[in-house]
Amino acid sequence: MSFVLADIFGDGAVLQRDKTIFVHGTCDKVEGEIVARILDSKKKVVATSVKTKMEEVEDKDAPKRFLIEFEAQKAGGPYTLEVSDKGSTVSIKKVYIGEVWVAGGQSNMEMPVGGYMYQPVDGALEHIKEACKYPEIRMFTVPRCTSQTPVEDCDTMWRES
């Protein structure tokens, strides 16, 4: 059995607080029931999944998509997110539950905090230094790609401030 969580659910991830939490990915086949848990640093269970849905596929050898649901959680962390069945376990470390902000747009959303060589942002260096005081701030950048079909995952990871 092999679980693969979507890249958004990697080490250092931030999950939205006070809202139902959904975790998804794919698996080859499942031995028993899929169970997911959120554990604190002392391995105490903070939350256990309340529902798991498996996609029905015609080809029995094709990977199946799964969706795991947790009840809303308060802000906190760092946690470990474990997804397992009777045969294997996948663990994601340094997971926080907090505020998730999504910024999207066109080329203007790619401008770095410091600006560009001939278009600097006033006070940027001070803001960048200040961000280092808050290691819980995370950033997940979805790389640009062109595709004729919907893309379900991307090859990237969470970064600390």
Task: Please name every model-derived segment.
Residues 1-161:
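Cell-envelope and extracellular/periplasmic
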